């Protein structure tokens, strides 16, 4: 009887734990130690890089963001440039008045090495080199690079034809 009551208590907890895990999604941190470093120090969008001040964003892009979203917990602000919050060109995450991340989902902007949305996986590897990791996240293939010296990460989201759909550059917090 005692085993049965333990089983009835523990079994639902195990099911809940398994249900909350997405087997198709592997966190990028898993690849950090096994991926060689790539220099990403010069990555920027119109001279705005990770660590730039929030004031540099509007100044360098020569316009104010079209949309601003404020999140209270954890505190950060998102500056969005584009037609809408869903169909944007570039989005900057501002934490403590500094850029901590930016996303590109249109070909209007490119990486420092000239990669735009629509470019191929081969173009990315030609520009950034062979020291990348590859993972799946919510059905998309992601290839990424770490700059361990400057604590930066860049990821390229690929569609089913291995074309770049989106680009994420962010500060590494480890």
Q: What is the role of each PLM region?
A:
Residues 48, 112-113:
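Glycine-rich loop/hinge motif
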Residues 1-8:
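Bacterial N-terminal signal peptides that target proteins for export
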Residues 22-24:
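Bacterial signal peptide processing site
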Residues 17-20:
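C-terminal motif of bacterial Sec signal peptides marking the signal peptidase cleavage site
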Residues 27-29, 34, 46, 53-95, ...:
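A cross-family detector of function-defining hotspots
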